[in-house]
Amino acid sequence: MSFALEETLESDWVAVRPHVFDEREKHKFVFIVAWNEIEGKFAITCHNRTAQRQRSGSREQAGTPASDGSRGPGSPAARGRSEAAASATAALRSPGPRKSQAWAEGGSPRSARSLKGDPPRGPAGRGPESPLRSPARAKASPLRRSAESRDAIASATPVPPAPPVPPVSSVRVVSASGAVSEEIEVLEMVREDEAPQPLPDSEQPPSAAELESSAEECSWAGLFSFQDLRAVHQQLCSVNSQLEPCLPVFPEEPSGMWTVLFGGAPEMTEQEIDALCYQLQVYLGHGLDTCGWKILSQVLFTETDDPEEYYESLSELRQKGYEEVLQRARRRIQELLDKHKTIESMVELLDLYQMEDEAYSSLAEATTELYQYLLQPFRDMRELAMLRRQQIKISMENDYLGPRRIESLQKEDADWQRKAHMAVLSIQDLTVKYFEITAKAQKAVYDRMRADQKKFGKASWAAAAERMEKLQYAVSKETLQMMRAKEICLEQKKHALKEEMQSLQGGTEAIARLDQLESDYYDLQLQLYEVQFEILKCEELLLTAQLESIKRLISEKRDEVVYYDTYESMEAMLEKEEMAASVHAQREELQKLQQKARQLEARRGRVSAKKAYLRNKKEICIAKHHEKFQQRFQSEDEYRAHHTIQIKRDKLHDEEERKSAWVSQERQRTLDRLRTFKQRYPGQVILKSTRLRVAHSRRKSTASPVPCEEQCHSLPTVLQGQEKTEVGGGGSQLGPSQTAEPQSLVQLEDTSSEQLESTSLPPRAVVSSELPPPQSAPLLTSIDPKPCSVTIDPLPPPLPPTPPPPPPPPPPPPPPLPVAKDNGASTTAETLEKDALRTEGNERSIPKSASAPAAHLFDSSQLVSARKKLRKTVEGLQRRRVSSPMDEVLASLKRGSFHLKKVEQRTLPPFPDEDDSNNILAQIRKGVKLKKVQKEVLRESFTLLPDTDPLTRSIHEALRRIKEASPESEDEEEALPCTDWEN
């Protein structure tokens, strides 16, 4: 029967909660009954004395003063009444003082005139009507006639007098004969109980908020007619029939037209009213003791009736029924297992084993029913989610929807996907719990049987050996299924952690959260390794059990004794077909068993190899985990060390900045003082001519040895100045353009020397080849590349020529350059050779008068070595340029030395197992066009995000470590063949 059909069949049934009317703690309740003359009904008031005492005691402890009147049963404060409660007493027709001494001393509990006199009644016998409506009053009875009568009744709710009135306890039943004596005892006991008692230390008083919320739970009130009280009596008698003779006899009420003519309520004297009030009060007390407060309060005051408090859903009831059946099956198995201690004979033990098998089958059936019922809602949710997602997908593909509708459908699809995922997780958890119950029961039965094996010998135990093998197989199978269910759950958790790691966003706590997730992942991975070890262990136990059973069968087949008819020879026996067939069948059966045993041995060997593989993976995982922790600690230590060093560096930097600021400040002050001094005392400025300054510098250079760097920078300036002088016609004075040219040349020389110094040797040669021909300084500065900055003044007119020294011997001719294989190499070589020739020509074109000062500064060997280095650089550059064999082939093709031979295209035979859809070359031959990829997309794909974002880099590193620690290569291994327990 389906669950939907069960719901429809049981829709008219209700489930009542068990022990719903049990009271957690006993409370003391007091009933006060009085007669309302305005409505002609009984006014019944009930007070919870225990709650009132707790509230008043907590108020005293909280420091809020409470008067005596606040603790009285009829106090307005006790019931949440207003100050107008006193006026409501005028509407009550209370009985006069009783003749008994007890009533004279204590006053009537029902009387409103015990301490306060009633106002005089009018001619009609009715007092003033009070507008008060008690907030603590509940609905009087389910048999109320109309809402208007309830409003009228509420206006005349009785308010009992002040505290001196002793309430009547509802503990005893007062009979008609001994009413007075019993009443005296009850009143005295109540007075003793009403004395203020200190609260025990264990009882903590409620707070003020709880007091306000529970104010309406201390008192209840209502108006009841004779008919209402009879209906209440019928309901109480249906609960307990002992109350049938206890209801007092009420006078007959007129009905129909008589109510219009003679009024609704019968005329009664004060003595009759007092007697009825007293009897009704005693009746209510007896009903409280018999039926309990919950039933009585719900019958009298039904305002706080909550159906959820009494009824429970049918699904919960059905689940409890399944659980009770499961508990009974568990207890049955436990009882049978306990009987093993007293059994001594093998026959009784075999009978007990049969009973255990039946009990376990009933346990498995009860467990299956329970968990099938628990799984059904999650299965329905999964199916509903899948169906809804499929509908959303079809709607998005086929319908013409706007962007907002598409966005809402996508959100709904994500919501249904999440619900389906949660349902799958719940199904997996319930599956694990199911197999835990069955595996635990099987394990208990198997352990008990192993303990029984020690009591009996091998011969007697042979009768139970087959059952023990079956039990071992069943235990291994149940444990294997439980472990595989756990493995699926752990894999789901791992997948969820990995997705959370990949979806982390930037933030202050992102790195810490990533570390926590990685740690959780490692813990889950270790748990997964343990579960996988248990799985392999169970598989090994299954194989071992099968091997043992097969070996036992083989030994039984071999030891089996077969009796044949007598024959003279073996050939004669084999001549008969039946005998030959039986012998061959036995041999074939033995061969099959032996082959199966060998297969099981091979599978067990593979399981052992896989266990070793998992053990190594587990060690790698632990090592990675420790390595991560060590890296974290090391990074923290390095950060601390670097932080201390950085602090020291920052301090030194601050000190240097302060010193430099102080120096610059002092320098500025000095300059300001000099400026003010010059402004205050202006003096005569003397300017020296250029010729005098150059002569002075020459005398200074001849007097003191000049460093090589200054010589290197001064020589080109002098040479260029002399050349300009000769070109200008040997004039005695230079124009502004002529004086500016040497300065520009000096600047060009400085920049070229800096470029040469900042580069390696081959670029230096290239740069030197690009300089103007008249400058030979790059060749000279390449010998000693040190930075130097020399300020050079404009050159004076040329000096008279001096006899030149003998010229240096000419350098040896350079070796012939190899033939360039490409345009770039030949162009570079030709350029460098021309630059070298220009340099030599410029050196030769320098007049002898100009080379006189440089004779004692340079040696010719330096120039020769510079030329050699330049040529070696050019040769090395050409070798690097033509080192590619493809360049040689292209150069030879240009020269026409050989021609290429046309080769026919080879067609490779296709692989037998390869499909054309997987071969990109075959697809291209068929005419499939390739998609053009833009360079920007490639550039974006090759950009490494981990280098730019530290969080992304950390996520990639964590995923890499996780991949190394996880057994992701299991799929590449040879998988175990599917076994019968996996089906």
UniProtKB/Swiss-Prot annotation:
- Subcellular localization, as worded in the UniProt entry: Nucleus; Cytoplasmic vesicle; Cytoplasm, Cytoskeleton; Endomembrane system
UniProt KW Nucleus keyword: yes
What turns on expression?
Accumulates in DNA-damaged cells (at protein level).
Compositional bias per record (Pro residues), positions renumbered to this chain: 158-167, 794-818
Q: Where is the composition biased (Polar residues)?
A: 50-61, 734-761
Positions of the region Interaction with p300/EP300?
1-119, 469-558
Q: Which Pfam families match?
A: JMY, WHAMM-JMY_N
InterPro entries recorded for this chain?
Answer: JMY/WHAMM, JMY/WHAMM_N, WH2_dom
Q: State the tissue distribution.
A: Widely expressed, except in testis where it is expressed at low level.
Task: Provide the primary localization.
Answer: nucleus
Xref: SUPFAM superfamilies: Formin homology 2 domain (FH2 domain)
Any GO BP annotation: actin polymerization-dependent cell motility
Say which family it is in.
Answer: Belongs to the JMY family.
Instruction: Reproduce the free-text note on domains from the UniProt record.
Output: The N-terminal region is involved in actin binding and actin nucleation activity.
Concerning PANTHER family, the annotation shows: JUNCTION-MEDIATING AND -REGULATORY PROTEIN (PTHR23330:SF8), P300 TRANSCRIPTIONAL COFACTOR JMY-RELATED (PTHR23330)
State what this protein does. Answer: Acts both as a nuclear p53/TP53-cofactor and a cytoplasmic regulator of actin dynamics depending on conditions. In nucleus, acts as a cofactor that increases p53/TP53 response via its interaction with p300/EP300. Increases p53/TP53-dependent transcription and apoptosis, suggesting an important role in p53/TP53 stress response such as DNA damage. In cytoplasm, acts as a nucleation-promoting factor for both branched and unbranched actin filaments. Activates the Arp2/3 complex to induce branched actin filament networks.
This chain belongs to which protein, by name?
Answer: Junction-mediating and -regulatory protein
Taxonomic lineage:
Eukaryota, Metazoa, Chordata, Craniata, Vertebrata
Gene name per UniProt: Jmy
